[in-house]
């Protein structure tokens, strides 16, 4: 089975401290832990944490803001046509498997 959410998708956070916020997926991370496949996504402007950075010869130290991964189950794809959250489906068009939005039926490029 393919990935439901991939880099470049517009998503909505459905649970957690950033519930209701929208952003674009920067990167999708897959991790295996205790025999389970875990999938996380880094979303722009979501789950921002402060990180202390040591000073080096090339850069100054200080506190920077970084985007941390969020579990894929806590985000939903946003339909660009209707502007609401939607589920993702798969179908074959000309012997090619493509993703589509179940709410509008639009194929996701």
Curated annotation (Swiss-Prot):
Record-level Gene Ontology MF annotations: rRNA binding; structural constituent of ribosome
GO cellular component entries: ribonucleoprotein complex; ribosome
InterPro entries for the chain: KOW, Rib_uL2_dom2, Ribosomal_uL24, Ribosomal_uL24_CS, Ribosomal_uL24_KOW, Translation_prot_SH3-like_sf
Transmembrane segment boundaries: none
Keywords linked to the UniProt accession: Ribonucleoprotein, Ribosomal protein, RNA-binding, rRNA-binding
Keyword Transcription regulation in record: no
Biological processes per GO annotation: translation
Family: Belongs to the universal ribosomal protein uL24 family.
Summary of the function given for this chain in its UniProt record: One of two assembly initiator proteins, it binds directly to the 5'-end of the 23S rRNA, where it nucleates assembly of the 50S subunit.
Subunit structure, as described in the record: Part of the 50S ribosomal subunit.
Name listed for the protein in its UniProt record: Large ribosomal subunit protein uL24
